[in-house]
From Swiss-Prot:
Inhibited by PMSF, but not by heparin, hirudin and antithrombin-III. Expressed by the venom gland. This is Thrombin-like enzyme gabonase. It is an enzyme of class 3 (hydrolase). Keywords: Blood coagulation cascade activating toxin, Calcium, Disulfide bond, Glycoprotein, Hemostasis impairing toxin, Hydrolase, Protease, Secreted, Serine protease, Toxin. Glycosylated. The lineage of its organism: Eukaryota, Metazoa, Chordata, Craniata, Vertebrata.
Length: 19
């Protein structure tokens, strides 16, 4: 998973990585 840890730290970054 790309940015799995990032998602927990910043939900907005998680969305950015998903797209």
């Amino acid at each position: 998973v790309v940015g799995g840890a990032e998602c927990k730290i910043d939900g907005h970054r998680c969305l950015a990585l998903l797209y």
